[in-house]
């Protein structure tokens, strides 16, 4: 029995006169799937074409973001669907965030030189969003595909080279394709829009910083989450708000960089002034959505929320956040070991989380590996790569957190704000003072 699928030329696929044609080609199943023991549902009507759709490139439910492009292709970007109309928006709103993510910023990042200049090609008119999909494009201008000639055959240890082949049977060799951190440009651009919506609508602020590089760990009590500023975070190349520990982290990265090696670390992210009530019980808890979003970033290997694993060493009486009434008559908690979320729903306190990143897998040291044709070999990877990803991961984490929160804000508004709220228990998702200053 034969099945029929439309075919398309892929990089690395076997050449054939049939490839690239618009007609259907027949794929013969192995003999063990003979017609005697393998049956497809019969269709009395004409044969229908099997549709194969790419998966995993779209994020969100109400505020939906699809990223596209590859590390050494023509460019990368995103399409944002579901952005509210009449939001003031220009390329400069996104560029400031893309510049924080941009490669080649310092000696502790990849030396690849890209301006990462973005262009909005749809979804805005006269400086305002129109409610239609917003397309953002960033060209690639500093590709060096020849750096990856050896890696077209030999798999980089702990990289996605092998697993992409295991899944698809074909992959983009140069720069890792979609598995490259360059894919995150689209996320950061969309995250800039999400951060602006959060700030204008509810006054919420998302900030992230580096809290660990290799064995250099910033003590939590050194940073006041209520008052830490973006200026403090951006005051050094490692994006640690404490100058003393920033120097120690930079030294740790320099030590492995000169040896052609790499290290990992931790990014801490906080959210201030987030409305209460975001998130839903059971399967779509707010911390679960945040964990999924952050763990979708390249090189992530761990996620902690609130007290995290340290909470497992406490008793209930030590861990519980006791309630009290503040001077404004609001219910608050005296401590914040819950990390601003209880029962999967935001409680109005500062949200805090930590995301662990592994050492960069592409290093210029000799490693044992195998080739695509299953021969053992040695590999010294070429190319330009970060000795530590965490300084540039800071805006990526902020972007993913902001995307989750805007999506949850829209969900809360549509589900729980349609009818009059219970003023004794619920708070309106009222606009921040900044939104009142926007002239439409």
Swiss-Prot record:
Keywords: Amino-acid biosynthesis, Aromatic amino acid biosynthesis, Chloroplast, Lyase, Plastid, Transit peptide. Residues 100-147 are annotated as: Disordered. Residues 118-132 have a biased composition (Polar residues). One of its GO terms (biological process) is amino acid biosynthetic process. Residues 1-54 form a transit peptide. Signal peptide: none annotated. GO terms for cellular component: chloroplast; cytosol. Pfam families: Chorismate_synt. Disulfide bonds: none annotated. Homotetramer. This is Chorismate synthase 1, chloroplastic. It comes from Solanum lycopersicum. The gene is CS1.
């Amino acid at each position: 029995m034969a099945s029929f699928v439309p075919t398309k030329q892929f990089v690395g696929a076997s050449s054939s006169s049939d490839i690239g044609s618009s007609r259907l080609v027949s794929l013969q199943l192995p003999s063990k799937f003979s017609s005697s023991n393998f049956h497809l549902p019969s269709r009395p009507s004409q044969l229908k074409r099997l549709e194969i759709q790419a998966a995993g490139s779209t994020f969100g439910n109400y505020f939906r973001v699809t990223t596209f492009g590859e590390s050494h292709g023509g460019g990368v970007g995103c399409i944002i669907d579901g952005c509210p109309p009449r939001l003031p928006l220009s390329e400069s709103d996104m560029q400031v965030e893309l510049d924080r993510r941009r490669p080649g910023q310092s000696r502790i990042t990849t030396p690849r030189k890209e301006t990462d200049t973005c262009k909005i090609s749809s979804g805005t008119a006269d400086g305002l969003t129109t409610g239609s999909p917003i397309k953002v494009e960033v060209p690639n201008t500093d590709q060096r595909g020849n750096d990856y000639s050896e890696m077209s055959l030999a798999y980089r240890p702990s990289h996605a080279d092998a697993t992409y082949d295991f899944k698809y049977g074909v992959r983009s060799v140069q720069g890792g394709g979609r598995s490259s951190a360059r894919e995150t440009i689209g996320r950061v651009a969309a995250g800039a829009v999400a951060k602006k919506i959060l700030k204008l609508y509810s006054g919420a602020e998302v900030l992230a910083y580096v809290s660990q590089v290799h064995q250099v760990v910033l003590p939590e009590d050194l940073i006041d989450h209520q008052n830490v500023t973006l200026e403090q975070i951006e005051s050094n190349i490692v994006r640690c708000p404490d100058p003393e520990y920033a120097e120690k982290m930079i030294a740790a990265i320099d030590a492995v960089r000169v040896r052609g090696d790499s290290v990992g670390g931790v990014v801490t992210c906080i959210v201030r002034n987030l409305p209460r009530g975001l998130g839903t019980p059971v399967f779509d808890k707010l911390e679960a959505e945040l964990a999924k979003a952050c763990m979708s970033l390249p090189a992530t290997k761990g996620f902690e929320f609130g007290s995290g694993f340290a909470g497992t060493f406490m008793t209930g009486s030590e861990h519980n956040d006791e309630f009290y009434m503040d001077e404004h008559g609001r219910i608050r908690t005296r401590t914040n070991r819950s990390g601003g979320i209880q029962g999967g729903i935001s409680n109005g306190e500062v949200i805090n989380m930590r995301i662990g990143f592994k050492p960069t897998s592409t290093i210029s040291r000799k490693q044992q590996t195998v080739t695509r044709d299953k021969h053992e070999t040695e590999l010294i990877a070429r190319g330009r790569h970060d000795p530590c990803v965490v300084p540039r991961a800071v805006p990526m984490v902020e972007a993913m957190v902001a995307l989750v929160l805007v999506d949850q804000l829209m969900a809360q508004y549509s589900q729980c704000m349609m009818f009059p709220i219970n003023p004794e228990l619920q708070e309106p998702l009222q606009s921040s003072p900044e939104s009142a200053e926007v002239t439409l």
